[in-house]
Amino acid sequence: MGFTTPCFILKNTLQLREKLEGLGYRIGNKYCIDNNFLATDNNEMFGIEEPYLPEECNGYIHCGFNEELFLAIAALRDDTNYKQWFVCTSDYKEFDGKEWKVGDFDLNTCPDDFDNILPHWRKATVNELIEHFKDKKEQLCVE
């Protein structure tokens, strides 16, 4: 149980690695962590020197330069809902001034029980995250 979707991004910064640490990743190979590009797999982050070509992603989601997409996909887990993106499944009014419509996205920033999902929401899929965060100029790899 844990992280479910390997991915990589065409950048590698200390700030981005710190955000991954905040999600629960650890450095897999400290000798490669400063390479040009950054990837995640299982609970590890690691640097890669050459990016995968979109047609050769080998199970990794190619996030281009899109940091929001990379972090959203890297956050996907099967043991928690924390820091995961959710999609609204039915129109409803949460409170005065806050209404949700089918298809709205929201980031869960509250630690919660994994089994305690609100009835109007479901976890976003990889394809939905790509569509939500995509930059029309980028070519992304989806399997």
Where do the protein language model's features map onto the residues?
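Short, extreme N-terminal segment that most often corresponds to the first beta-strand
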Residues: 1-28, 143
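Charged interaction segments
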Residues: 23, 31-143
